[in-house]
């Protein structure tokens, strides 16, 4: 029969393992605004926060959170209750987002599996420059630092942003759906985004733009890196 002291040690060890799993499963994101203008940061999960130049918003993802996305909104106006509108990235007229943002918006995407997977995505278009910076120095820090709006074709341009061809035209060729679901090459439109931001997803099948890092890594997301 196990002694009381042995049982106590087993209990302490079990608690330590449980705490370790919880700690390594939780992830912290520091969202920083380095733009020369106000950005209303958004996250699913997380909600939203107004960030003036130099401000940081911290989002702690609970252990077991499988995916998240973050983006910046511009040209926003909210009342005291948190209701309003944004020129780009609007999420149903709410300061604290519970739904995805309207296109176009530059996205930081995160998925947790056997390790962390993350990417900067222009699949929904572009509104502001963005980077993802892991705390693990061995991991890649992808960024889209260029002002894609400056080279946006007229047919993709909207106030404050540049739509992707998929968002603008909604065709199988540009969205990699239907007959293009299994074989979907880059297009002249996606190459505009890729040439400006080589590390970012430029269209739905641009899988070379996914990066991986060991689980337990924290991240900072920087607007206007």
Swiss-Prot record:
Q: Does the UniProt entry include the keyword Transcription?
A: no
Keyword terms, alphabetized: Allergen, Disulfide bond, Glycoprotein, Pathogenesis-related protein, Plant defense, Signal, Stress response
SUPFAM superfamilies hit by this protein: Osmotin, thaumatin-like protein (SSF49870)
Q: Which residues are glycosylated?
A: 188
Which InterPro entries is this protein grouped with? Osmotin/thaumatin-like_sf, Thaumatin, Thaumatin_CS
What the entry lists under Gene3D superfamilies is as follows:
Thaumatin (2.60.110.10)
**One biological process GO term for this chain?**
defense response
A Pfam family hit = Thaumatin
Q: Could you confirm whether the keyword Glycoprotein appears in this record?
A: yes
Please list the disulfide bridges: 35-224, 76-86, 91-97, 139-213, 144-197, 152-162, 166-175, 176-184
What is the annotated signal peptide range for this record? 1-26
Function description: May be involved in disease resistance.
Q: Which family does it belong to?
A: Belongs to the thaumatin family.
Identify the PANTHER family for this entry.
Answer: OS03G0233200 PROTEIN
What is the protein's given name? Pathogenesis-related thaumatin-like protein 3.8
């Amino acid at each position: 029969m196990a002694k009381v002291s042995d049982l106590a040690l087993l209990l302490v060890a079990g608690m330590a393992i449980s705490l370790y799993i919880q700690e390594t499963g939780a992830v912290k994101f520091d969202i920083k605004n380095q733009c020369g203008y106000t950005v209303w940061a958004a996250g699913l999960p997380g909600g939203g926060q107004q960030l003036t130049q130099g401000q940081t918003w911290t989002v702690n993802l609970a252990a077991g959170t499988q995916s998240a996305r973050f983006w910046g909104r511009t040209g926003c106006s909210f009342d005291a209750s948190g209701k309003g509108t944004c020129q780009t990235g609007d999420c149903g007229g709410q300061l604290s987002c519970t739904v995805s943002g309207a296109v176009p918006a530059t996205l930081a995407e995160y998925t947790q599996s056997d390790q962390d997977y993350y990417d900067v995505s222009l699949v929904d278009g572009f509104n502001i420059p963005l980077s993802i910076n892991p705390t693990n120095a061995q991991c890649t820090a992808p960024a889209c630092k260029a002002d894609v709006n400056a080279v946006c074709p007229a047919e993709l341009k909207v106030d404050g942003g540049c739509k992707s061809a998929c968002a603008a035209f909604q065709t199988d060729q540009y969205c990699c759906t239907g007959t293009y679901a299994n074989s979907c090459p880059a297009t002249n439109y996606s190459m505009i985004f890729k040439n400006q931001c080589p590390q970012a997803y430029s269209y739905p099948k641009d899988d070379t733009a996914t990066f991986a890092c060991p689980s337990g890594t924290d991240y900072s997301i920087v607007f206007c890196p």
